[in-house]
Amino acid sequence: MGWGGGGGCTPRPPIHQQPPERRVVTVVFLGLLLDLLAFTLLLPLLPGLLESHGRAHDPLYGSWQGGVDWFATAIGMPVEKRYNSVLFGGLIGSAFSVLQFLCAPLTGATSDCLGRRPVMLLCLMGVATSYAVWATSRSFAAFLASRLIGGISKGNVSLSTAIVADLGSPLARSQGMAVIGVAFSLGFTLGPMLGASLPLEMAPWFALLFAASDLLFIFCFLPETLPLEKRAPSIALGFRDAADLLSPLALLRFSAVARGQDPPSGDRLSSLRRLGLVYFLYLFLFSGLEYTLSFLTHQRFQFSSLQQGKMFFLIGLTMATIQGAYARRIHPGGEVAAVKRALLLLVPAFLLIGWGRSLPVLGLGLLLYSFAAAVVVPCLSSVVAGYGSPGQKGTVMGTLRSLGALARAAGPLVAASVYWLAGAQACFTTWSGLFLLPFFLLQKLSYPAQTLKAE
């Protein structure tokens, strides 16, 4: 199979017709699931992994500890080493997402010109390399290096949404985005449980196995979904617009889309920008609390890695159930209303998690949290996928994913800092109230007719 051809593992002439939509969705689902299984193995292990580097007196980790302790003393705070790992986790998560933020729009713009398949394969090679670096070394520096390489290469997620956005019918796009949500749910169900059951030294090797399998699977079975006649004229045009793709203000204004060929009309562009702001605010708030959740349960309830894995398993199982029974059945045009309901549920969800001192209260909060997490991103992605001409789909979805990466870059660091400074209750209470901001923005959304049709 050549880099730009259709399915199968042997060379053949390029395919000029659109591949079957069901096949594309299935390949995207399975490939993304393998990627997420590798990624989520780490989630229940992170608190213990960071603490193990501290106990091993790793020189780089020790220098981080010393710097944070010095800063705490300088501002008159008591030195609380047990909260330092929360801050470090936020820093690592933010660094990973900063690199996603920088690379995702460039990945999308490049795929608009070269096609989805070759760029996807390059991203997956980088992801596999990141796990190989982690697997072959036990130092904190090597772990950080693997996270940085992974962040640079993580454009495969935005490419998955761009591939679904290439599909011809609004119903196929809507169902495809829901299936991507199912892949996330299953990945966050099975991956953490598997990671928690593995010895710490085996986890990176299993992640590498999943990543290598994903690369081989996509190489053999992913067809090209962007025909030559619908591609952008040149990569140079995309790189020339790098400022639009990397500037936070330009991203929020979708400037790369507005200045491209065949941009959306004025009303639709205004709606697209508001949807982008909602997406950014939601993920900024959600990712911050999501990243601190495992540290809260580790410190308040003394959850072990196995218990963390069980928690993420139940979260993922709930999300997968909601995705299959509810989210994928939302009809085109009903996504915004579903998102508003989910945002309102997050207010009591995070209040219960932040203040709960018993496992039943925590469980109720996690149930509401899981419902919202299963709905918001797939529904917003489905709506946004209806904007832009066929040659702009990669740029539209790459810009959206860059907004998400920017939110995930800032969210964990800000939430972890508030957690470190003021504690879990103050952090979760403040963030739960802030979820009303994206809700009110959607209340005022001008939702043009025919949104789900391709431009």
UniProtKB/Swiss-Prot annotation:
Membrane topology qualifier: Multi-pass membrane protein
Family: Belongs to the major facilitator superfamily.
Keyword Nucleus part of the UniProt annotation: yes
Keyword tRNA processing (UniProt): no
Transmembrane segments: 27-47, 86-106, 113-135, 148-168, 176-196, 202-222, 275-295, 310-327, 336-356, 359-379, 421-441
Tissue specificity as recorded in UniProt: Expressed in luminal membrane of renal tubules (at protein level). Detected in all tissues tested with higher expression in heart, splee, kidney, leukocytes and prostate.
The species this protein was found in: Homo sapiens (Human)
Protein name: Major facilitator superfamily domain-containing protein 10
